[in-house]
């Protein structure tokens, strides 16, 4: 398994950590103090840049504790970090609560999960193969 190269963009940045040996996600830490008011979205820097292997991408997910205790979660629900991106990983956090929330430098703000992907070529066609489901969507298969 290859090593993931991580560049600290400031000496005070915190390297990602995993909560347990089997944890799928790496905790990402805030590199700054940020106040997020109710209904507001703020970009929070991690102070880190990554070099992840080709054929994989980084998915940035909410941390369950931050979402349930402070109402903070990534604004775009899941962030996608491509393997050729070399800039700082920044998490856009949205405050879903009725109270202001302070993110402190060193707080865990999200989790990064590395996943493989398939880059299949796409072609335009006039017709698609029929299936039993057809065009049924949005609950069409039941509750």
Residue ranges and their predicted role:
Residues 1-143:
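DUTPase catalytic domain/fold
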